[in-house]
Amino acid sequence: MARRHLDRARREGEPREAGLARSALGDWWDLPDAPVAVLLVRAAIRQHGHDFTGALADLDRAVSADSRNVQAWLSRAAIQQTTGQLRAAADSCRRVVALSDHDAGHVCLADLASMQGDQGALDRIARRLEGRHIGAAATGWILTVQAEMAERLGRNAAAEALFRVAADTAAGSYARVAYADFLLAHDRAGEVDALLATAPPTDAVLLRRALALQRTQDLRAAAVVAELRRRLAPPMGEVGTLHLREMARFSLEVEGDARTALDLATRNWSLQKEPADALLLAAAARAAGQPRAAAPVREFIRDPGLFDVRLHELLE
């Protein structure tokens, strides 16, 4: 039941479903010695709520209790990557490969290698997967990861081809949102609304629609922007952590408020250090006329290391 509510929360962007997922665990929510299956679900719920420290603690307990649990290592790698612990993420991915030679482990390692500028990583994973029968859900995820790898490496034609297939294949809206970002970055806002027309109206989807409609001077933009403003408004004047990335980008690209965007992007960087977060902080610092505010990104590029042609162009 908890997993079902969490899946709905991810798919529909409905906060109530995440709360129901937590409630479904009952007393297990606060017990450190929960069964491994419960620890995995609890970690996923915490990850969804951006409690990455709590999620990793649960996953550490899970792999301590069952060191051969592939899903625990995969989830651990994903959160470590999100929080910028790239070396630890690679170690977790290697555990997956050692345990099962799982495709996801190889994709994870290739993704991390591409972040270090390994131009051959994309081709290696493509060769490994060529001709293999993979389920639709896994295929959509893998194609999206490959597309993001290609984009970071500056291989835009390959990225677009992969994004297009991923958007048609993957469940949920993540692939379509990622493709929408690609289109927006290449001045193709006119293609975004059709791409997202049937996507669940999550905050991420609405943000891309707002950007596209605004850039194409579509009269529907005002209503979408108003809905986003309502959703992202912090309760009682308090800014939480769940929507920091979306709030920062909304402030920067929709509202044109670079100072607020920089504050939000800086706070977001303290939690999440994915390429999208680095790009956001660098862009906000540049727009606000405060290049020194992008220093944490420059440091991250040096150690643990992050190669992204978009980021290097932005920081020049």
Annotate each language-model stretch with its function.
Residues 11, 15-18, 52, 86, ...:
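TPR-repeat structural position
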Residues 41, 75, 108-109, 145, ...:
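Canonical tetratricopeptide repeat
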Residues 3, 7-10, 44, 78, ...:
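Residue-level recognition of tetratricopeptide repeat
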Residues 33, 67, 100-101, 134-137, ...:
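Short coil turns that delineate tetratricopeptide repeat
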